[in-house]
């Protein structure tokens, strides 16, 4: 079911900037987004960037110790959101970096919010071409455990996420 919700050009630009991996100067690399959260505009007609809800690569290791935990804390407990998370992980063979599209629909969100976000997901998903990993999660316990993200990225082959070991 389509909701008729539009995706703002800023959202598409952020996605394209996060998706393209090319040589950046050290200053440009610091400004690259590690995570960003999207929400519906107040009139519920457009998917927009949620103000102040982003993590920059330059923040990691400075004022953001654990980017994944910081990302999870940015999500509201009682409302839906879409997000992009640039996951840095290691498999048994190699280090990888992939974008993950997250649809956060917590059980505590209103039925109306869940319905409009669910029916609008295709609008944003169609604009995010080339995403390999998509994750819909509904409980804080589920999203708070980095092993669940690792399962989406490659299951048991993932040994670390953001430089932190996952399995012993």
Curated annotation (Swiss-Prot):
Origin superkingdom: Eukaryota
Residues with the N-acetylalanine modification: 2
Span(s) of short sequence motif Nuclear localization signal: 30-34
Keyword Cytoplasm: yes
Localization per Swiss-Prot or TrEMBL: Nucleus matrix; Cytoplasm, Cytoskeleton; Cytoplasm, Cell cortex; Membrane
GO biological process terms, semicolon-separated: actin filament depolymerization; actin filament fragmentation; actin filament severing; cytoskeleton organization; cytoskeleton-dependent cytokinesis; regulation of cell morphogenesis
One annotated Gene Ontology cellular component of this protein: cytoplasm
Disulfide bonds: none
Gene Ontology molecular function: actin filament binding
Role: May play a role in the regulation of cell morphology and cytoskeletal organization. Binds to F-actin and exhibits pH-sensitive F-actin depolymerizing activity. Required for formation of the cleavage furrow during cytokinesis.
Protein name: Cofilin-1-B
Protein family membership: Belongs to the actin-binding proteins ADF family.
Pfam families: Cofilin_ADF
PTM per Swiss-Prot/TrEMBL: Inactive when phosphorylated. Phosphorylation levels vary during development. Oocytes contain only the phosphorylated form, and 80-95% of cfl1 protein is phosphorylated in unfertilized eggs. Rapid dephosphorylation occurs within 30 minutes after fertilization. Phosphorylation levels increase again between the morula and blastula stages (5-8 hpf) and then decrease again as gastrulation approaches. Dephosphorylated by pdxp.
Tissues in which the UniProt entry reports expression: Expressed diffusely in both animal and vegetal hemispheres of the oocyte. During cleavage, expression accumulates around the cleavage furrow, along the vegetal membrane, and later in the midbody. Strongly expressed in the animal hemisphere during blastula stages, with most cells showing expression by gastrulation. By stage 17, expression is highest in cells of the developing neuroectoderm, and at stage 24 the notochord, neural tube, neural crest, somites and some cells of the archenteron show high expression.
Keyword annotations of the record: Acetylation, Actin-binding, Cytoplasm, Cytoskeleton, Membrane, Nucleus, Phosphoprotein
Entry keyword annotation includes Acetylation: yes
InterPro entries noted in UniProt: ADF-H, ADF-H/Gelsolin-like_dom_sf, ADF/Cofilin
ADF-H domain: residues covered: 4-153
